[in-house]
Amino acid sequence: MGKGGGRDKYEPAAISEHGNKKKAKKERDMDELKKEVSMDDHKLSLDELQRKYGTDLSRGLTTARAAEILARDGPNALTPPPTTPEWVKFCRQLFGGFSMLLWIGAILCFLAYGIQAATEEEPQNDNLYLGVVLSAVVIITGCFSYYQEAKSSKIMESFKNMVPQQALVVRNGEKMSINAEEVVVGDLVEVKGGDRIPADLRIISANGCKVDNSSLTGESEPQTRSPDFTNENPLETRNIAFFSTNCVEGTARGIVVYTGDRTVMGRIATLASGLEGGQTPIAAEIEHFIHIITGVAVFLGVTFFILSLILEYTWLEAVIFLIGIIVANVPEGLLATVTVCLTLTAKRMARKNCLVKNLEAVETLGSTSTICSDKTGTLTQNRMTVAHMWFDNQIHEADTTENQSGVSFDKTSATWLSLSRIAGLCNRAVFQANQENIPILKRAVAGDASESALLKCIELCCGSVKEMRDRYPKIVEIPFNSTNKYQLSIHKNPNTSEPQHLLVMKGAPERILDRCSSILLNGKEQPLDEELKDAFQNAYLELGGLGERVLGFCHLFLPDEQFPEGFQFDTDDVNFPLENLCFVGLISMIDPPRAAVPDAVGKCRSAGIKVIMVTGDHPITAKAIAKGVGIISEGNETVEDIAARLNIPVSQVNPRDAKACVVHGSDLKDMTPEQLDDILRHHTEIVFARTSPQQKLIIVEGCQRQGAIVAVTGDGVNDSPALKKADIGVAMGIAGSDVSKQAADMILLDDNFASIVTGVEEGRLIFDNLKKSIAYTLTSNIPEITPFLIFIIANIPLPLGTVTILCIDLGTDMVPAISLAYEQAESDIMKRQPRNPQTDKLVNERLISMAYGQIGMIQALGGFFTYFVILAENGFLPIHLLGLRVDWDDRWVNDVEDSYGQQWTYEQRKIVEFTCHTAFFVSIVVVQWADLVICKTRRNSVFQQGMKNKILIFGLFEETALAAFLSYCPGMGVALRMYPLKPTWWFCAFPYSLLIFVYDEVRKLIIRRRPGGWVEKETYY
């Protein structure tokens, strides 16, 4: 990049340039993440390496030089991602989204009070109260949300490893253990099995060293490390060990080539933490909703402002009306309701092992339409398990279930006894100490994955392997290496009827078979003829085709005359036979699917969610697991399957004929975005195998280009860019790395894919329930606003006061609205397609038309009916009320006449008016009963859904009790200007309540009977 030579030309545009720079940097970072790692230290010879880093390959750096480098480069640690200061987080909760609307309302109230105080001698304090209450609501709910998020981030903090890592370095020719943060470039470092690699190392000597690279490359098998340069790609070559991967076995020495943020791991972490996650769908929905509500409020306010001027009110009165209408339109209680709904769901999910870091992420999961899932540990159990054996010329199935409830096989065969003996003896894995009381499958093992699988299998089937090894003491062994691909050991044989030395060997099946001349069948040795070789080949191909890792086993009794007791076996200059052995059988292993996964994948499919597997593993294994868990469903073929069935080359098959598709990482590398889009569009079932972490990011972007809302699961550092880019990143709590947990929005505490599906269901439920809650809350807006409008137009005494509106929004409506968050899912929740964020909004025109235009209008009628009844009982017939307002509200007029000629003083009139306010308020509570019950469902009948929601039933009683308390409690006349009512006045609104219930049940019945009809199109929100 240039050094900014053309800077002076653009001086005036500095501001926009800053924005563009930020954007350009974001795009640059994104491209950086998609690039493969570039470094050349693995290609250097040892001399060049020594010169480049100014170090000594045997004595290491001097202490003084190391101190200089540490001062220059800084500590060997990852820079923590930039955190948002707490006060900023708090302000976001106080002034973000919905809160802003309430703040504006509060300011308008204070403004109105100011105008009244300046112009009237005894101003009413309504607007002052209203402003104070609105401010209080925002502050309380803001604190509540802030507290919730702070709680989640506390749990996050606890994940961080508190133990400072140590590293063994050679300085001044002496070994010393130092804090890993003090390791510098050029240091000579020693690592052994069990250590975490402290920085990026170039290996200069190694002894049987293997590292677990799964968190970086996704390879589940431990990778050998040696001084040899074996691959151009630094991630694949054997002579580089990466920062924060673990050394599983063996020892190695290496020179530090990168530290801290400059390591491969550090680069990914830094770039990922810089990626911006977009706005969550629910935040966008709430913003959309605020626009609608504000639009309606301002439209009504301005309309009536103009109308009141036409009706010859003064300017000041018109402004007060304007503010009153805007404030009456703001659903004050809704902010608290939304926060509580999200919090409840987050708590519910925590109980089901999902930790939600960001409350809004809960809903995002519900609108997910594509899940890109890792294979190892998420879909599978993350432990190699013996799946099949082949002996006595047939395949036997082993039990791969997590609780050993599956199939078993014939364990009495003499061949099985020989096979299990070889698998137990020719095996370096051991159980760690003091685990006698732990179930065998759960025990910790020292050794590599395949050997642990064999150890556990033999321990389950044949009893203690340790006792077997004690009976057959090991004399010598040749460990497995990649050139001869076998492992061999010779043991003392306790059985007196057989020769006293037993040689056992295991390794790559074809290599083992080449060394055999006979085969064991039903305990008898037979010559290995072509027919049996074919049988072996078929079994090997069948097990390999299942994606299993197959090992061959053979043995040989060494004749006593050649190998008497005390014979000195030599493994360097081999003095015992390695040919003409006796083949015993095959054992194949796989990392089996978790028990709950196939069902979870099935649920995703019926919920219209596409599950894509993305793994670093081999295509055959990936495809086998995909078939095992139902990501590739039965009967669906890939291009290769079709080619094999029709016996034609793959190039002749039309890719559109194949529903399923397995894409190899190396093919993905050469694809254009258009080709990737084509695959994502035309195949319903996709597996990406042998992918690099960078490609995971490309796949996520591809899905998002299709308009999908993408959830990604991952546990490695390599997954963090994809986790950050996805609409919702899901990290693993047990196997996950710290970096991936920081990048994710949600953490699965049990690493189980099935928990994601629970999350999807909860996410959809929260969206449904928020809709219901909003529909319920908005409905009462109409009976709150119409009295005000009629008051302006028809000049009648005010039917409902500001204070009473607050009692509804923040009093009686609060608990019922929140209780809808506890409503159970309707029966079709996981059978629907995912919602389309473009068209299916949280608040749409249909919801507004139902709440405002239909149910709200019936409620307003109920309120007005009560109002007219009370005034008529007091002598003011409806016709007499028109135009009465001017005299009614004039405190100096004490002789207003009613329909019967009686005169009313100002005080008497006001008591009747406030009684009307109270009655109108009670009527709204009564019609809200029916509204609450109908809001329980959107499609099902309330009778189908039932009244199992105890909180909702409590809500009904609570709002009624509160209304009664406000009406009958002594002293309310002074405090809130609410007066006691005659019992009969409670019943005025009952018919309207019943009408609402019947009207809505009929509407839902028509929707169920005529799906897609006009009733559904016009009223189904």
UniProtKB/Swiss-Prot annotation:
It catalyses: K(+)(out) + Na(+)(in) + ATP + H2O = K(+)(in) + Na(+)(out) + ADP + phosphate + H(+). Phosphorylation on Tyr-10 modulates pumping activity. Phosphorylation of Ser-941 by PKA modulates the response of ATP1A1 to PKC. Dephosphorylation by protein phosphatase 2A (PP2A) following increases in intracellular sodium, leading to increase catalytic activity. The modification N6-succinyllysine is found at residue 659. Residues 107-129, 307-318, 791-800, 865-916, 969-983 are extracellular. InterPro entries: ATPase_P-typ_cation-transptr_C, ATPase_P-typ_cation-transptr_N, ATPase_P-typ_cyto_dom_N, ATPase_P-typ_P_site, ATPase_P-typ_TM_dom_sf, ATPase_P-typ_transduc_dom_A_sf, Cation_transp_ATPase_P-type, HAD-like_sf. The keyword Ribonucleoprotein does not apply. One of its GO terms (biological process) is intracellular potassium ion homeostasis. It is found in: Cell membrane; Basolateral cell membrane; Cell membrane, Sarcolemma; Cell projection, Axon. GO terms for cellular component: axon; basolateral plasma membrane; melanosome; membrane; plasma membrane; sarcolemma; sodium:potassium-exchanging ATPase complex. ATP binds at residue 485. The active site is at 374 (4-aspartylphosphate intermediate). The chain crosses the membrane at residues 86-106, 130-150, 287-306, 319-336, 771-790, 801-821, 842-864, 917-936, 950-968, 984-1004. Pfam families: Cation_ATPase, Cation_ATPase_C, Cation_ATPase_N, E1-E2_ATPase. Residues 80-82 are annotated as: Phosphoinositide-3 kinase binding. It is an enzyme of class 7 (translocase). The keyword Transmembrane helix applies. The modification Phosphoserine is found at residues 16, 38, 45, 226, 450, 482, 666, 941. Residues 1-37, 214-233 are annotated as: Disordered. Signal peptide: none annotated. This is the catalytic component of the active enzyme, which catalyzes the hydrolysis of ATP coupled with the exchange of sodium and potassium ions across the plasma membrane. This action creates the electrochemical gradient of sodium and potassium ions, providing the energy for active transport of various nutrients. Could also be part of an osmosensory signaling pathway that senses body-fluid sodium levels and controls salt intake behavior as well as voluntary water intake to regulate sodium homeostasis. Belongs to the cation transport ATPase (P-type) (TC 3.A.3) family. Type IIC subfamily. This is Sodium/potassium-transporting ATPase subunit alpha-1. The gene is ATP1A1.
